[in-house]
């Protein structure tokens, strides 16, 4: 397959017009690339009018360099400048040679596969999202190619406020259980909880091989150990590797996100190539490792991509997501300004780039660093063992050793940036931590943004910190790990999919992502907004939702999985909002005559001593219900319980406008 000159010329024009401002990453990236859609439409006209060939191009080295990693001056700071290369060589734990193009990195086996890959006419695939849509969390997608199924990610979601007592929510995999004989494996994009958190629960029901990058699998292994799942084989994959799962082939592509070792996936099926971006951003100056492999996206785009499932989280935000390195400069300024104070930094445990920058900044300012929070300690230990974090010698100290150093010579990195009640920061703010408590003069940096639904908890912890006279800094101390609108335009343009399927976001995020895809040339009717459980079937030039499968989340409460359904939750909500009324009575076993009672017990409903009239009225209602039951000559006490419950509920609503949980207890005498 030949690469047309018009395409490459268009890419150059696109870059000059829309990305020039990225040449200096110190600038505010949010203001970069705000060109009109007309520029993108102009570019896309030449790109989309030419039908992509499904044969791989053997001679694309020059084109590959042109898109990413070449020495063209106009590519600014993300080209192969010497400084960038030196940094990458020092910090990249993988063995791949820095600066090599996608083609040069490819093994002979992979090259041969791609040369011979050609989708078949009339072949069809199914794409089934079992989670991850209309919410942030529980990401899991099924790709089905005739007799082969692969599963992409398997995450959990945190419970909403109405799920009382629930610890987390995992996906319903009933469809996978029914088709277990087709499952060839699970492939993982990265190691965040919303992508790997449900794996231990699912593996207890479904046995399948798991594939992912080094850090991702290390985190999964830790989870399996927590659940006492030992001896399970996890298969490590390097970037640009292609693995065979039945008749499906999966290629791992380097991306950037707020956790290292994140990957996009190119899935080669009989019907065509399906790409899944995973969670990603375009960061040309990452703190750790290489920048996103845009050349890889472009090469696969030239082959012809059937469908692109793309991260939509930040689709509603214009411009570009700022580089992670900008946060390091903010940290430096804060450390410089507060040189006489103790500094506490709270962030996501999995954000190793952020943790690394805090440690490096502390080391430069001669401060000792203590780590607080179980998940933070675990992840840093794993990352250190794998070589993803190099901590300067003598920088880390145990928490109990902090007392040996003056406050202005210490930094504490902790969990709890989301206001979690039992996390380390929350316990510090409430004076419940054995070793560390917040005191006047402390500088607390919240280096994250609240996950949707956590805003109240975060505001509460900020208030607690203020009450303890701490200085709280939470503005400009975080950058997102998700692509904004201009980055999505770039990816949609490079990949040039036949179908755009926005994922990972609430409906408004996915709708805006669909608009972005349309703005760069994807037909409106081919921008598909699926719902969880939809079975999308793609065959030739048609894509249609053919069916729906079970997709409600499964609630996890303690050690119980799936035993807390809607009925139990409804009872919990009733208990939480209106309390409980127990009606106890003793009846004759032969005549159903009332022998004793009814006795009324109120829990969380009303104070009995101050509600005598209400309670006496309720007793009369119960007695009347018993008489109605006896007059029917019935001998079914289930019917009596139902009669008493209904009458009591009607009475209480009529008199006091409340709906407590009513529980009748009948004793046979």
Positions of predicted regions on the chain:
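Broad gene-expression machinery/nucleic-acid interaction feature
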Residues: 247, 262-264, 580-582, 662-664
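Histidine-centered active-site/metal-ligand motif
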Residues: 190-195, 257, 276, 476-485, ...
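Hard-cation-handling environments
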Residues: 317-447, 451-617, 623-633, 641, ...
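Intrinsically disordered, low-complexity RNA-associated tracts
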Residues: 1-106
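C-terminal tails and terminal domains of large nucleic-acid-associated
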Residues: 633-641, 645-669
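Conserved hydrophobic residues forming the short capping helix/wall of the S-adenosyl-L-methionine
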Residues: 224, 517, 652
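His/Asp/Glu-rich metal-coordinating catalytic cores
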Residues: 92-185, 192-404, 423-437, 456-459
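Conserved beta-strand scaffold positions in the cores of enzyme catalytic domains, especially
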Residues: 127-129, 234-236, 307-309, 444, ...
